[in-house]
C-alpha cells in the first residue's frame, strides 16, 4: 500500500471516531439520539402529576364560535318545536280515536268541526299513529260526515 493511501484511510478513520464520540458524549448522555429523546420524554412524564397534565385547547375565533352556538340553539329549538307538535298530534289522536271509532262518531264530528280539523286529515293521523282503521271504516266515516253536513252527492265520490 502506498503511504498516501494509508494516510487518507487513517484520516478518515480519525474523523469518523471523532464524530461518533462527540455525538455520544454531548450533554453527558452516552446514548444515541433516538434513545436520548425517548429518555427525555419518559423523564418529563415522571415529573408531571395528573392535575398538572397540559391539555391543548384549540380556541375558535369568536365569530365562528358564536355562529356555531346560534346554529346549535336553532337546531335545539326546532327539535323542541317538532316534539311539541308531535305531542299535540298524539293528544288529538288520543282525544278523537274513541269518539270516531265507536258509535259516538257524530259527537266526534261536532268536536272536529268546532276545532276546525278536517276529517280526512284526522283519519290520516289515526291511521299513522297505529289506530286500526279499515278502508270500510274510513268510507263509512266519510259518508256519515258528508250526510251529516248535507254535502251534495257529487262531492261524495271525491276525496
Curated annotation (Swiss-Prot):
Cleaved signal peptide residues: 1-19
Keyword Signal: yes
Motif (RxLR-dEER): 38-54
The UniProt record lists the keyword Iron-sulfur: no
Subcellular location, principal: secreted
Annotated compartments: Secreted; Host nucleus; Host cytoplasm
Family from the record: Belongs to the RxLR effector family.
Chain's role: Secreted effector that completely suppresses the host cell death induced by cell death-inducing proteins.
Name of the protein described by the UniProt record: Secreted RxLR effector protein 50
Organism: Plasmopara viticola (Downy mildew of grapevine)
Amino acid at each position: 500500500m502506498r503511504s498516501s493511501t494509508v494516510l487518507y484511510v487513517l484520516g478518515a478513520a480519525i474523523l469518523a471516531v471523532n464524530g461518533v464520540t462527540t455525538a455520544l458524549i454531548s450533554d453527558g448522555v452516552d446514548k444515541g439520539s433516538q434513545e436520548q429523546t425517548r429518555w427525555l420524554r419518559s423523564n418529563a412524564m415522571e415529573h408531571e402529576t395528573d392535575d398538572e397534565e397540559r391539555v391543548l385547547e384549540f380556541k375558535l375565533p369568536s365569530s365562528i364560535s358564536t355562529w356555531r352556538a346560534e346554529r346549535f340553539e336553532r337546531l335545539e329549538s326546532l327539535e323542541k318545536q317538532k316534539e311539541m307538535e308531535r305531542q299535540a298530534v298524539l293528544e288529538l289522536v288520543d282525544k278523537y280515536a274513541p269518539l270516531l271509532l265507536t258509535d259516538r262518531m257524530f259527537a266526534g264530528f261536532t268536536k272536529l268541526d268546532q276545532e276546525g280539523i278536517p276529517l280526512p286529515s284526522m283519519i290520516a293521523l289515526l291511521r299513522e299513529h297505529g289506530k286500526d282503521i279499515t278502508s270500510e271504516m274510513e268510507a263509512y266515516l266519510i259518508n256519515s260526515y258528508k250526510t251529516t253536513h248535507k254535502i251534495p252527492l257529487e262531492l261524495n265520490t271525491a276525496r
